[in-house]
């Protein structure tokens, strides 16, 4: 076999691999964007529900009931379903940015940035507030429930609204990416 023939064979093999890889990637785009959008939607819905229903409802409670309820909900929310969507939203958006193709990529990148932003808000704001609320101890042993609530509620609500907006933005960007996939 000559050098030219070997080079032609290698070029042909690489071309076939590229076609196969491109075809496989094209088959993944739709389902991947769908999964990313569904998970982003679940996250946006979670934060939306907290912003529009849970926190306004809790706002009407006395300090003792508010602190106790939030402590219990902060325990309950740390479960496999929530954690998989919480971490899955930016991971799936990032995967979509890699595999969705050039027409959809800018929107998938924007979705990834927004989904990561949601995590940053959570890790820098909401989770430390949750931890501080838990560190205050059982409601029966907290001396100043009003102060504990005041240190938590207003900022947590604002941060959750920011998470709602960023995760809804990620969902919107993923929908736009899906509309541009070719």
Where are these regions (language model features)?
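Transmembrane helix-loop junctions and nearby membrane-interface residues
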Residues: 48-51, 97-104, 123-130, 175-182
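Hydrophobic alpha-helical transmembrane segments of integral membrane proteins
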Residues: 112-133
């Amino acid at each position: 076999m000559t050098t030219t023939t070997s080079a032609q064979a290698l070029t042909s093999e690489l071309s076939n691999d590229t076609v196969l890889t491109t075809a496989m990637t094209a088959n993944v785009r739709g389902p991947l964007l769908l999964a990313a959008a569904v998970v982003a939607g679940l996250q946006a819905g979670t934060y939306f529900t907290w912003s529009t229903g849970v926190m306004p409802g809790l706002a009407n409670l006395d300090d003792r009931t508010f602190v106790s309820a939030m402590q219990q909900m902060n325990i309950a929310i740390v479960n496999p379903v929530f954690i998989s969507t919480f971490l899955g939203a930016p991971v799936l958006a990032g995967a979509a940015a890699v595999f969705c193709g050039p027409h959809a990529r800018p929107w998938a990148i924007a979705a990834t940035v927004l989904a990561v932003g949601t995590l940053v808000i959570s890790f820098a704001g909401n989770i430390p507030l949750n931890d501080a609320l838990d560190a205050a101890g059982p409601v029966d042993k907290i001396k100043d429930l009003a102060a504990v609530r005041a240190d938590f509620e207003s900022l947590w609500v604002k941060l959750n609204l920011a998470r709602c907006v960023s995760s809804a933005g990620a969902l919107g960007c993923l929908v736009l990416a899906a509309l541009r996939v070719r």
